[in-house]
């Protein structure tokens, strides 16, 4: 067995997100309010997976971590999420050009999110939707 794994080439579209980001966000259930925080993105195990850590400066929003991966046989992406409340969720992920979408359909809470990476790579615009 070798000490390092090869990079998962299917996750290459996530590379522009690597690093630390400042966040400014809104929430569909809290119209007119703006929230700030941080997000960081990094490779896990030399690129076998991609990790997202997020935290908003408002106690109403949990600090969370997500791991992105792929299924090479099905040509699909997924995200596994966990936060400080003990909530864990699985999301389906789609990548097209500079746009990353993740979603889940569940009886109690369905969610959709879209991130669009700017052409210059200096910002990411996100939009979230949810239904209960």
Enumerate the language-model features and the residues they cover.
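Hydrophobic small-molecule pocket/channel-lining residues, especially in calycin-type beta-barrels
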Residues: 1-132
């Amino acid at each position: 067995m070798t000490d390092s794994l090869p990079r998962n080439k299917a996750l290459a579209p996530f590379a522009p997100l690597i690093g630390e980001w400042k966040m400014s966000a809104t929430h569909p259930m809290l119209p007119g309010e703006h929230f700030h925080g941080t997000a960081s993105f990094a490779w896990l195990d030399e690129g076998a997976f991609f990790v997202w850590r997020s935290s908003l400066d408002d106690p109403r929003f949990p600090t969370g971590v997500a791991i992105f991966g792929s299924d090479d046989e099905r040509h699909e992406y997924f995200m596994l999420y966990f936060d400080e409340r003990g909530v864990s969720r699985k999301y389906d992920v789609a990548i097209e050009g500079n746009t990353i979408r993740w979603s889940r359909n569940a009886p109690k809470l369905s969610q959709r999110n879209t991130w669009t990476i700017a052409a210059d790579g200096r910002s990411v615009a996100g939009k979230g939707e949810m239904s209960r």
